[in-house]
From Swiss-Prot:
UniProt gene name: argC
Family: Belongs to the NAGSA dehydrogenase family. Type 1 subfamily.
Reactions catalysed: N-acetyl-L-glutamate 5-semialdehyde + phosphate + NADP(+) = N-acetyl-L-glutamyl 5-phosphate + NADPH + H(+)
GO molecular function, one term: N-acetyl-gamma-glutamyl-phosphate reductase activity
Keywords annotated in UniProt: Amino-acid biosynthesis, Arginine biosynthesis, Cytoplasm, NADP, Oxidoreductase
Organism, as annotated: Rhodobacter capsulatus (strain ATCC BAA-309 / NBRC 16581 / SB1003)
InterPro entries cross-referenced by the UniProt entry: AGPR_type-1, NAD(P)-bd_dom_sf, NAGSA_dehydrogenase, Semialdehyde_DH_NAD-bd
GO cellular component: cytoplasm
Name of the molecule in the record: N-acetyl-gamma-glutamyl-phosphate reductase
Active site annotation, chain numbering: C149
């Protein structure tokens, strides 16, 4: 039976990416799209690349009849998302793409997002949406908390290494390059073409980036003790993609073997042969992740690279992967999209 889908916040980049992928999903049908500021418009007017798809017009959230919806994707900003989800029917399955339900500790949420959490009852039932590590929990979840795109990239590189005990937990550095679509669609001066093209800049450096909250939570959980990493993201003048270069202390061959073993049976995660490094070009527009490992000239140190598309595996693609599990569908359904190259 075809699953009826609503996308809340469909006028943003992640909402558009959800619509693009679900349009060819054999077991999902989009029956409602919300975009309050663009209510009444056709999706093809907001995103011309979706003109050929027979999508419903954008409406305000309160105009949607959720009684016939099987699952809702919530692609709204943090704080807004929790308020909206709190008003949805409690038997409705929800995949939230915002940061609102990622952090289990209310104090940590307030620390990183600057305001108290207003729906802790929902937070208690949310399952963190890093699919390959929470697969069984997601199969029975009602509410999924989608990961941050940067947080997903860093965890794919580091989490198996903590599990395998092959790195020094006190010396982890994540240097990450992110495409500009990760900053959203809102008009911002630093995202103007003249401000960004031809250059790059770090942002939220010095331990200020919000995705550090996810790293702290998840790495510490796996290690069984506090783990803190250095993390500096950089805004790049390309649209899609994340490339994380991770510096760790450990034997390079053991690190490569740990990643290869952990992801051996994962469809969307490919560990490249030792010495080959990941590239954003090779995964653009897809739900695939490439990981590469190489030794450093300094003995006992390794460099791990991970590439993913921030809008697909870093957000909307992974959201659909999680929704498949929640709806009892094959996990890869609708997601075997070949990367776009060049």
């Amino acid at each position: 039976m075809t699953q009826k889908i609503a996308i809340l916040g469909a006028s943003g980049y992640t909402g558009a990416e959800l619509a693009r992928i679900i349009a060819t999903h054999p077991e999902m049908e989009i029956t409602a799209l919300s975009g309050d500021r663009k209510a009444g418009m056709r999706m093809g007017e907001v995103f011309p690349h979706l003109r050929h798809i027979g999508l419903p017009d954008l409406v305000k959230i309160e105009e949607i009849d959720f009684s016939g919806i099987d699952l809702a994707f919530c692609a709204l900003p943090h704080a807004t998302s929790q308020a909206v989800i709190a008003e949805l029917p409690r038997d409705l399955k929800v995949v939230d793409l915002s940061a609102d339900f990622r952090l289990r500790d209310a104090a940590e949420y307030e620390k990183w997002y600057g305001k108290p959490h207003a729906a802790m009852d929902l937070q208690a039932e949310a399952v963190y949406g890093l699919t390959e590590f929470y697969r069984e929990e997601l199969k029975t979840a009602r509410l999924c908390a989608g990961t941050g795109c940067n947080a997903a990239a860093g965890q794919y590189a580091i989490r198996p290494l903590i599990e395998a005990g092959v790195i020094d937990l006190d010396e982890i550095v994540i240097d990450l390059k992110a495409g500009v679509s990760g900053a959203g669609r809102s008009l911002k001066e630093n995202l103007l073409h003249a401000e960004l093209a031809g250059g790059t800049m770090p942002y939220s450096a010095g331990g200020k980036h919000r995705h550090l909250g996810e790293f702290d939570q998840e790495f510490s959980k796996v290690a069984g003790r506090p783990v803190r990493v250095q993390f500096t993201p950089h805004l790049m003048p390309f649209n899609r993609g994340i490339l994380a270069t991770v510096y760790v202390r450990g034997t390079p061959e053991d690190i490569h073997a740990a990643l290869a073993s952990r992801y051996e049976n994962e469809v969307f995660l490919e560990v490249l042969p030792f010495g080959q490094l990941a590239s954003t070009r090779s995964v653009a527009g897809s739900n695939f992740v490439h990981l590469g490992v190489i030794g450093d000239r300094l003995p006992g140190r390794a460099v791990v690279t991970v590439a993913l598309d921030n809008l697909t595996k870093g957000s909307s693609g992974q959201a659909i992967q999680n929704a498949n599990l929640m709806l009892g569908l094959p996990e890869t359904l609708g997601l075997m999209l070949a990367p776009v190259f060049p």
